Amino acid sequence: MQGNPGNQGNRESVEESYSDMRTNLLVVDGFYHNVDGVRQFALSQEFDVIGNYPGKRTKAFNNDSTQDKIQNFLYPHAGKIIDWMESEDQYCGSFQISYATDRSWIHTDDHNNWAGVLYLTPNAPTTSGTGFYRSKINGSIYGKNDDAVGDYAQDKTQWDLVGEVHNIYNRLVLFRADQWHTSMEYFGNNNKNGRL
């Protein structure tokens, strides 16, 4: 595009008006080389951890190789990860299974700065991904679960869907954990055909 040299002052004022931009979301397709093997490993585990989330989880399987790979994606946008939350009551690296009967709610993940979801069900409904929301109450896409808008976590009439990442096999979604988000839908009725 060719510009008019007489508009140089306008260009500088536009450049000075940029905000402090922030990366909120990274999508990585083809995360695992041997995704079928990872899926089989996941399905061979005990899904016996039940908590304040839909479905059931395994214990955490966080390892150096996975941490390094995630760190390489996040570093340019968020700097070095200093806490992988490896205590017994955290779920970093765990597998989660849920079925069509499960339900979620709009929430944030207050205990960390970034969150991640890796889709491990082949041929899943693409509409069963992760949705991101803006509050109709205060217009914010960021918050904490104890905010007043968090009281409306299950009332989707109080929210606008502002972004969605589809569920694609072997897709990793990394996102700022203070964004309002939820799982879009669930499917299946057993570990082999449920949302992993």
Question: Where are each of the predicted segments found?
Answer:
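Catalytic core of non-heme Fe(II) oxygenases with the double-stranded beta-helix
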Residues: 98-196
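Non-heme Fe(II)/2-oxoglutarate
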Residues: 3-106, 129, 136
